[in-house]
């Protein structure tokens, strides 16, 4: 029987080669030691420079990527990719650490609850913000732009007029503001309510339309530096309207309304503060009289402007005649003047 020694030698060589490879593979397989760890032959790792952490073992033969807590769908990886694999019963979490499977499930549940809670909180906050936009508190200090309030002024106060009187929300009305400086205009934003309007301009049934102080831009311009009798009439009305000819603030009924309400802050809003050098926009005095007020608002100054109680108003009174002075007696007495026109010594 003839045997081809060449083929035989080749077969023996192949057999020996595969046997050697098989033994090498068996030696490289990890052996399970204590729970949570693996005893690994680090021979291959020495060649690759890879060192596995706790609960991991080295793997260079898998085709798929291992499972992760947030991704259970295996994806194809590069063949023979060399990396560390989580031990049996462990899974890699979002921090790339191998944890027990039950810990992974708990972590996912907590994340779901956190996300749901966060979504609910965001939804509640958005709802709360929306409600604030339409709440009474958020619209009750809108400095008098609502149409219903404008209608109360006998149909002649429009948006432009309100802006002239009280300033726009962004306080850009300082230039043509007839009564206030920009600082005072800012004070009006959010604090002018219906009661204040009634005190300053009268109620709708008082027919203030004819003598309304600031209806048009032209009238507003008149106030700048030219306070005269005509301007005062525009502001305070004429005698036939029972305003005591040039009575600066009130009829008897209106004077009663002011008692206990008009304080220093209100006077500042109406007439301006002393440091504003009252000359240009002051509704009661000429420039000379305005100069008297700067820093010297006291009892003597008030007497010069409004007269003394003992009917000696005629000599020094800048706005009224003796007849008008008599009209004041019994309405504005010393006590009332203190309440209405009192200023702290400046």
Curated annotation (Swiss-Prot):
Which parts pass through the membrane? none
| InterPro entries the record matches | Ser_inhib-like_sf (IPR036084), TIL_dom (IPR002919)
Gene3D superfamilies, from UniProt? Laminin (2.10.25.10)
Query: For this UniProt entry, which residues form the secretion signal?
Result: 1-28
Which keywords has UniProt assigned to this entry?
A: Host-virus interaction, Inhibition of host innate immune response by virus, Signal, Viral immunoevasion
Give the CDD domains listed for this entry: TIL
Q: Any one Gene Ontology biological process term?
A: symbiont-mediated suppression of host innate immune response
One matching Pfam family, short form? TIL
The residues covered by the TIL domain are 52-104
Function statement:
Counteracts the host humoral immune response by inhibiting the processing and the amidolytic activity of host PAP1 and PAP3. Thereby, melanization of host hemolymph, normally producing several reactive intermediates toxic for viruses, is deregulated and proper immune response cannot occur.
**Assembly and oligomerization:** Interacts with host PAP1, PAP3 and SPH2.
Similarity section: Belongs to the polydnaviridae EGF-like motif protein family.
Record-given protein name = Protease inhibitor Egf1.5b
